[in-house]
Structure formats: C-alpha cells, structure tokens
Amino acid sequence: MAMNYNAKDEVDGGPPCAPGGSAKTRRPDNTAFKQQRLPAWQPILTAGTVLPIFFIIGLIFIPIGIGIFVTSNNIREIEIDYTGTEPSSPCNKCLSPDVTPCICTINFTLEKSFEGNVFMYYGLSNFYQNHRRYVKSRDDSQLNGDSSALLNPSKECEPYRRNEDKPIAPCGAIANSMFNDTLELFLIGNDSYPIPIALKKKGIAWWTDKNVKFRNPPGGDNLKERFKGTTKPVNWLKPVYMLDSDPDNNGFINEDFIVWMRTAALPTFRKLYRLIERKSDLHPTLPAGRYSLNVTYNYPVHYFDGRKRMILSTISWMGGKNPFLGIAYIAVGSISFLLGVVLLVINHKYRNSSNTADITI
C-alpha cells in the first residue's frame, strides 16, 4: 500500500500517527546532553601555559631517570654462558647425544662481593615461548588437580596429550619442553677445595601459582598412586611425582615446574632457578673470589640455535638490573626540557614583532 508523503512527518522523523494514537518520532529528547548543548571548557594553549609544562616534565623526569639508572648500575650481576657450541668451551663435549649424563664445570671469578640475597637464574635465547600454539598447549584443569582432566586431558595438549595409550601428566608442549639442567655453585677456597654454596629451591614461584593455580590430584599420601594410570611427558627423564623428595615441592606443585609453566613474552628470557640467602650481616653472601659452576647438561638448545646461561644477580627496590627504564626517563625529560628551551627562544624572538602574528601553540 502506498503511503502519502507529508513534510511534517519527515521533520518529526517518523510516519504519520494512526487515528487515535500518539505520534511516533525518532527525534532525540530535547535535553542538553542529547542535543550536545552541555557547557564545555576548551583551554587556549599559549606560550605562557605550555612552556612551564615542558620544563616541569623535564625537571621531574631527569632526576627520576638518573636515580633509576644509578640504582640499576649498583646491582651486581654476572652472566655465565654454558651453551658449549665453542670448541674451547668445557661444555662442548656435552653436545654429543652419546654422552648421557654429561657434567661440565665452568670456572669464573667474582671481582666484587655480592651483598644481600642473591638470585640465580637460568636464561635461554631464541626460544619462542610466546608462539600461539605453544602457549595454548596445556590443560589448566589438569594442573589444578582435577581428577577427570588428569585421565582425559584437553585436546589443546595435542600432540603431547597421550603416549603409549596413557594420558600424559602434565600434558602439552610447555610441560614437555621443561628446562631440566642441574646447576651447582661452588666457592674455590684458598686451599683450592670447592665449598658448595647453599641453593634454596623453594620460594621461587609466585604465591598465587603455588597455592591457587597448581595442585596435585586428591588422594592419599602416596603421590605415585594419585598419578596412577598416567605417563610422563615424552622428553622428561622421570615422572612428575619424582621431581623432588620433598612432598611439599613434588608433583604439580614443584616450584621449578611452576616457574617454567609461566611462559615468557620474548624469545630471550630468564627464569628464577634458586635463591642464595644471606646468612650474616657481617659477611657478604658471595664474597669476591674464584667460583665454579657444575652443570648437569640435559637441555639441548643447539638444535634451534639457542643459547643457555646462568645469571647471578642482586636486586634493589626497583627489582633486577634494568638500565633501559632509567635511560627512557632521562631521554623523555631531556627532550621535553630541550623543546621548552627552543619554544621559549622562538616565543621571545617573535613576541614583540609587529610583522608576525602572535604565536600560540
């Protein structure tokens, strides 16, 4: 049926009303908000208001950057690469798959003492834990101790979901590629006798991961029975219930395992391996001197052109060593201050000139 055209209907924004009915309209309500009549304030950016902002930013950012940079430089840190691809490296012999297990020793010297608690990290390069399929290759329900997920893992774990017709625990590519080198640190005394450094392996994982996200399957005191019917990941040397003799650090709640399962965002990363606690305020945690690093070499990285390293580091109120943050603050503050000076010169030069318009920014 044809509809008669009515100019008033177009203005009202709707069809004519039916006899006896109310008029329908799409016109917004006549309010300040819907009609965009709210009061507004728009600042006029003049040299007198903008220039102080540039100088204030510069005067704030530069001292902060200097403080962060100096603090970062005061952090003691040493890296020992033990990949072993160089023929002269003590770990070069471990690249052969026939040498199992392989133990190599790297000697190094600390020029300055390490005060306070010392953190030992392992670092990997050219390892892309941020790959989409790799990140998804896990079953969080299984890791949280769910009994049904233990025997029937998620399909996201493929191709590391089942092996030998048994479900893998823990399943997935992340768990299958867990770092498994063993690192031991020794201080070489005056009599050239190695003194072992106590390495604490508990307290390296996030509290929320240890107590919330990761749990062993329910059951009795025998952890092996709780994982009955499952098999170890393909690349693991032992099952998950044999990761540690300490029952509070075994199975899915093993802290080395928990740390590894928190994937890194970049291909070059470090993960906390051990803690070296300070025993006395009278003596440094790691005195200057000669040390040796004993490595049980299990984790091959040369297949993907990767590298491995051990890092010893102290920390400060801002965390670990990170000179970039201080440099960034100094750079932003310097650029802001320099722009303020340039704009101040331009404004001073042309402010009283009658041949040019007033400069507004």
Swiss-Prot record:
GO terms for biological process: phospholipid translocation. It is found in: Membrane; Golgi apparatus; Cytoplasmic vesicle, Secretory vesicle membrane; Apical cell membrane. N-glycosylated. Contains high mannose-type oligosaccharides. Keywords: Acetylation, Cell membrane, Cell projection, Cytoplasmic vesicle, Disulfide bond, Glycoprotein, Golgi apparatus, Lipid transport, Membrane, Transmembrane, Transmembrane helix, Transport. The chain crosses the membrane at residues 50-70, 326-346. Accessory component of a P4-ATPase flippase complex which catalyzes the hydrolysis of ATP coupled to the transport of aminophospholipids from the outer to the inner leaflet of various membranes and ensures the maintenance of asymmetric distribution of phospholipids. Phospholipid translocation also seems to be implicated in vesicle formation and in uptake of lipid signaling molecules. The beta subunit may assist in binding of the phospholipid substrate. Required for the proper folding, assembly and ER to Golgi exit of the ATP8A2:TMEM30A flippase complex. The N-terminal domain seems to play a role in the reaction cycle of the catalytic subunit such as ATP8A2. This is Cell cycle control protein 50A. It comes from Pongo abelii (Sumatran orangutan). The lineage of its organism: Eukaryota, Metazoa, Chordata, Craniata, Vertebrata.
